[in-house]
């Protein structure tokens, strides 16, 4: 019975750590860039697009398709960075339970 109580306490502590990690993830922001920094965008931890910055040189007539491609590339860069940060935060929160056989792959 003592082992069960200990296991329950560990599970509750892990649940709190995971909730804290989700809060940290929601607050994070990552920047993605493309075109050598000509396009920058910021994604929130929720995946929401927060900001897009375009270099003024991209505002020239006929650059629309280039701008669109650069925005997509910057978004992909930011999304990759966000996924990496989210996984890192969740692995830290899960502690010894991260990567356990039989556990769902959440991060």
UniProtKB/Swiss-Prot annotation:
Signal peptide: none annotated. Its main location: cytoplasm. It is found in: Cytoplasm, Nucleoid. One of its GO terms (cellular component) is cytosol. Pfam families: YbaB_DNA_bd. GO terms for molecular function: DNA binding. Gene3D superfamilies: Nucleoid-associated protein YbaB-like domain. The keyword Cytoplasm applies. InterPro entries: YbaB-like_sf, YbaB/EbfC. SUPFAM superfamilies: YbaB-like (SSF82607). The keyword DNA-binding applies. It comes from the Bacteria. Keywords: Cytoplasm, DNA-binding. Binds to DNA and alters its conformation. May be involved in regulation of gene expression, nucleoid organization and DNA protection. Belongs to the YbaB/EbfC family. NCBIfam families: DNA_YbaB_EbfC (TIGR00103), PRK14625.1 (NF011218). Homodimer. This is Nucleoid-associated protein PHZ_c0369. It comes from Phenylobacterium zucineum (strain HLK1). The lineage of its organism: Bacteria, Pseudomonadati, Pseudomonadota, Alphaproteobacteria, Caulobacterales.
């Amino acid at each position: 019975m003592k082992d069960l109580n200990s296991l329950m306490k560990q599970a509750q502590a892990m649940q709190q750590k995971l909730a804290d990690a989700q809060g940290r993830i929601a607050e994070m922001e990552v920047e993605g860039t493309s075109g050598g920094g000509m396009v920058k965008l910021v994604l929130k931890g929720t995946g929401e697009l927060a900001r897009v910055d375009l270099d003024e040189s991209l505002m020239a007539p006929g650059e629309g398709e280039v701008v669109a491609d650069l925005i997509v590339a910057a978004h992909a860069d930011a999304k990759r960075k966000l996924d990496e940060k989210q996984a890192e935060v969740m692995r830290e929160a899960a502690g010894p339970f991260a990567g356990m056989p039989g556990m769902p792959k959440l991060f």
